Amino acid sequence: MSNEASPAFESVLTALKAEKVIAYPTEAVFGLGCDPDSEKAVNELLILKKRPWQKGLILIADNYEQLQPYLDDKLLTEEQKKAMFACWPGPVTWVIPAKFSAPKWLTGQFATLAVRVSDHPLVKQLCTFYGKPLVSTSANLNGLEPCRTAEEVRQQFGDKLPILNGDVGGRKNPSEIRDALTGELYRQG
């Protein structure tokens, strides 16, 4: 990975720093993302998606350390952590107890947070350059299929947000979602 970002990459980073929503490719579909610490940006994302805040959101990161400020992982056993780390980096999202200080705009009505360490090269690079995880939800309007190309993002959202152009990974389905405490499967991947 280069230590310098391209101009297109820089424009997406600038948008993140300005508390804007961006679109970017992930393992299966394009995602909408923003700075998880910006209530303004998260609210903008929720409005774009027509998604109620109570549902909570997913954080996507380059590495587990980026997620730790939001998580109360001391509630997990070594065995539970081992199961989680065996799936990362990769397309499995784990629901983990959140720190009490984790913003409600991320956790929604829950005391947990859904998190994933991505293996998509552009996601990894984006989180590395930005220095923290991103909120990640599929790029699609309510009732429409998730976007798989930058052009589909433009068709659904117009010019409302900057797009990091690139290919999605080879997966057909969105990430699997599992509960780290119970192992329960919430969504098949």
Curated annotation (Swiss-Prot):
Under SUPFAM superfamilies, the record lists: YrdC/RibB (SSF55821)
Gene Ontology annotations of biological process type = regulation of translational fidelity; tRNA threonylcarbamoyladenosine modification
Ranges where the YrdC-like domain occurs: 6-189
Taken from the UniProt entry, a GO cellular component term is:
cytoplasm
- Localization annotation: Cytoplasm
Per the similarity annotation, which family is this? Answer: Belongs to the SUA5 family. TsaC subfamily.
Name of the featured protein: Threonylcarbamoyl-AMP synthase
Q: Which organism is it from?
A: Photorhabdus laumondii subsp. laumondii (strain DSM 15139 / CIP 105565 / TT01) (Photorhabdus luminescens subsp. laumondii)
List the top taxonomic levels of the source: Bacteria, Pseudomonadati, Pseudomonadota, Gammaproteobacteria, Enterobacterales
Q: Which gene encodes it?
A: tsaC
